[in-house]
Amino acid sequence: MATFHFDLVSPEKLTFSGDVDQVDVPGVEGDFGVLAGHAPVVAAIRPGILTITTGGTPQKIIVLGGLAEVSEKGLTVLADVATSIQELDRAQFADTIASMEAKLAEKEGSELDKAIERLDHFKSIQSQLNTTALH
């Protein structure tokens, strides 16, 4: 399988840089996979699980929004937050969801809609974390 260069950057660090077979990205308009030779595109990403496949081995990383750019040079993801599943404190993640739920009562209108959407994304990540495929 042909490979391409992939960089995953967050404000804290360069999380990943190297040649990969495939990257599956949680896009705002829907999830999408990137392979070598993918057409150029810029897309917003939503909170979700990004999967990097190298040599047939998947590596899963939680991203909490950002931007993905596919160019002739490869794929670059600028993530608001990027944490490998192994590094995630699941109890803290559950506490974050509980806190988000508690704060919903303080929101109104479009602010409430955005908060509900973000909460739904976090709950989706939590659900995926609880599946055996990620362990």
Curated annotation (Swiss-Prot):
Keyword Ion transport: yes
Cellular component per GO, a single term: proton-transporting ATP synthase complex
Membrane topology per record: Peripheral membrane protein
Keywords: ATP synthesis, Cell inner membrane, Cell membrane, CF(1), Hydrogen ion transport, Ion transport, Membrane, Transport
Gene expressing this chain: atpC1
Signal peptide: none
SUPFAM superfamilies xref list: Epsilon subunit of F1F0-ATP synthase N-terminal domain
Family: Belongs to the ATPase epsilon chain family.
Assembly information from the UniProt record: F-type ATPases have 2 components, CF(1) - the catalytic core - and CF(0) - the membrane proton channel. CF(1) has five subunits: alpha(3), beta(3), gamma(1), delta(1), epsilon(1). CF(0) has three main subunits: a, b and c.
UniProt GO molecular function: ATP binding; proton-transporting ATP synthase activity, rotational mechanism
Descriptive protein name: ATP synthase epsilon chain 1
Pfam families (alphabetical): ATP-synt_DE_N
InterPro entries associated with the record: ATP_synth_F1_dsu/esu (IPR001469), ATP_synth_F1_dsu/esu_N (IPR020546), ATPsynth_dsu/esu_N (IPR036771)
Cysteine disulfide partners in this protein: none
Cellular compartment(s): Cell inner membrane
Organism whose genome encodes this protein: Nitrobacter hamburgensis (strain DSM 10229 / NCIMB 13809 / X14)
Gene3D superfamilies, per database record: F0F1 ATP synthase delta/epsilon subunit, N-terminal
Function: Produces ATP from ADP in the presence of a proton gradient across the membrane.
Broad class of where this protein is predominantly found: membrane
